[in-house]
C-alpha cells in the first residue's frame, strides 16, 4: 500500500508578534520567498568558475487576506507605527501543524499598505512583509 499524506489549510498557523493571522483568502494565502541572490557564479575566460554565496537571510512574506480580515487593521497599524516612530516591527512564526515545515524570523515589517479595492464582491488584500533573519526549520 502506498504512503498517505494529508494537508489541511486549517492546520497552518501564522503569528505576527502576538497577533494570530485570520481571514485568509480562499486560494494561496501565504508565500515565503528568499530575497537574496542565493548562490551566483562567474565563469572566467579560461573556464574557471567561482561561486559566491549570498549571506542574506532576508525573506519576503506575502499574506493574502479577505477584505474583512481583522489582520488588515493590525498590519495597517504596524505600518503606521513604523512610519511614525520606527517601532512597527514584529516577529514572524509560520507553522504547518500536519507537516514538518516551519518558518520564523524577525524583526519583520510591512513594506507598504495593501491596495484598497472595492467592487461588487469582496476583494482580497495582499500584504508584503520583509522578514530579517528568516529561516526554515
Q: Residue locations for each model-derived region?
A:
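Generic recognition of well-ordered secondary-structure surfaces with a strong bias
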Residues: 63, 92-94, 129
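Residues on the solvent-exposed faces and adjacent turns
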Residues: 131-133
Amino acid at each position: 500500500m502506498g504512503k498517505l499524506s494529508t494537508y489541511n489549510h486549517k492546520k497552518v498557523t501564522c503569528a505576527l508578534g502576538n497577533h494570530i493571522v485570520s481571514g485568509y483568502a480562499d486560494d494561496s494565502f501565504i508565500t515565503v520567498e528568499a530575497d537574496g541572490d542565493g548562490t551566483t557564479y562567474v565563469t572566467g575566460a579560461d573556464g574557471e568558475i567561482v561561486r559566491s554565496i549570498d549571506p542574506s537571510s532576508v525573506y519576503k512574506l506575502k499574506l493574502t487576506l479577505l477584505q474583512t480580515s481583522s489582520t488588515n487593521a493590525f498590519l495597517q497599524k504596524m505600518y503606521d507605527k513604523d512610519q511614525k516612530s520606527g517601532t512597527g516591527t514584529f516577529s514572524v512564526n509560520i507553522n504547518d501543524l500536519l507537516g514538518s515545515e516551519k518558518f520564523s524570523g524577525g524583526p519583520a515589517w510591512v513594506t507598504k499598505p495593501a491596495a484598497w479595492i472595492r467592487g461588487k464582491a469582496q476583494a482580497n488584500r495582499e500584504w508584503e512583509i520583509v522578514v530579517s533573519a528568516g529561516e526554515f526549520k
